[in-house]
A protein has these predicted regions:
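Generic N-terminal leader/processing signal
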Residues: 1-2, 122
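Sec-dependent N-terminal signal peptides of Gram-positive bacterial secreted proteins and lipoproteins
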Residues: 2-22
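Subset-of-secretome marker
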Residues: 21-332
Length: 332
């Protein structure tokens, strides 16, 4: 199922490359111009920042409490196209219930000898002197085929997959560069269309999968606003902003309420003030991306955790901490 879903994810990823609209052009011709502009790019470098400002408001009927949650992070991303590889290095600061945590991260994804994808990720928290590595290899992924597929998608393909774009009537200026401003929205309806298209191509109803159905339920109401700024002269996307600030949090709030079901008369509401990502990108030669020897040694020695297990534990920990935080607020 993972391999089949990759097709849909590739479509969503390719959406970030559909740029450079001009009123005298069609979407297809502009998309081709973008492909021509990026075809010779041997690599790309991105500087990215993210911000989360949220709160959980809790009430037991007589007392109201608010639990602030904040997160900020900066990341530097490098990518090469042949072979396909990425390097992500950055850090995050998290704060909740008056407690702060600083985390340093780095991740390396490289094309394996069999064409699959190998990912090595390192995390070090402020309470951890050494940090630890996690590893995953997926041989079901053919990175070369995925790259070829993303380059072959057209604007018409995007529409078929539920992705539509809006071009601002006026040019925007980004770091002194005149740019086209192109925006799109990815929501549960978009994801549902992608899932149905993947099901058609796979000859299998993926919506019947329990894990997929549960994920779609969690995503219901969430909305991702994306704006791309495209160099008007080169048709290269040089900046991007994303936010989820227009999301309907009804479903997430119902999950929080379920976690507090044991607390009679208690209600809780998640308030999202800002959840955004900003990135700027440059194109050109990027130094070869290599996995650090310490990461390879950790895997060989069996000291690296599974990335799948790490992800599952993070989700479980987040759910537990949210419930405990809300319960503690009520107790106060």
């Amino acid at each position: 199922m993972k391999k089949k879903l990759l097709l849909g994810l590739t479509v969503l990823g390719a959406a970030s490359m559909l740029c450079g609209f001009d009123s005298a052009e069609t979407a297809d011709s502009l998309y081709q111009k973008m492909l021509d502009a990026t075809a010779d790019a041997s690599g790309a470098s991105m500087s990215m920042g993210m911000n989360l400002d949220a709160a959980i408001n809790v009430s037991d009927g007589t007392t109201d409490s608010s639990l602030g949650i904040s997160m900020s992070g900066t990341f530097d991303v490098n990518a090469t196209m042949d072979p396909v590889a990425t390097e992500v290095i950055g850090s995050m600061d998290l704060s909740a219930l008056g407690q702060g945590q600083h985390m340093e991260m780095k991740s390396y994804s490289v094309t394996a000898e069999d064409g699959g994808l190998e990912t090595y990720s390192f995390t070090k928290e402020s309470t951890d002197d050494e940090g630890s590595w996690a590893y995953n290899k997926d041989s079901n992924i053919d990175m070369t085929s995925l790259m070829d597929l993303s380059k072959s998608l057209t604007a018409a393909d995007m529409a078929d997959w539920g992705l539509t774009f809006t071009l601002a009537p006026e040019a925007a200026t980004v770091n002194g560069t005149e740019c086209y401003e192109l925006s799109t929205v990815i929501d549960s309806s978009t994801l549902d269309t992608v899932l149905k298209k993947v099901s058609e191509l796979a000859g299998e109803d993926l919506t019947s999968d329990q894990d997929v159905a549960m994920a779609m339920q969690y995503l219901d109401g969430l909305k991702l606003n994306i704006t791309y700024y495209v160099d008007a002269a080169t048709y290269l996307p040089v900046s991007m902003t994303m936010d989820m600030n227009d999301s309907d949090l009804t479903v997430l709030n119902s999950l929080i309420a379920s976690a507090l079901a044991s607390e009679e008369g208690t209600s809780a509401e998640l308030v999202l003030n800002d959840f955004s990502i900003n990135a700027t990108t440059s194109y050109g030669d990027v130094a070869a991306i290599t996995v650090p020897q310490e990461a390879i040694d950790a895997v060989a020695a069996g000291e690296a955790a599974s990335l799948d297990d790490v992800a599952e534990n993070l989700v479980a920990d987040a759910e537990t901490e949210a419930a405990e935080a809300a319960t503690e607020a009520v107790a106060e």
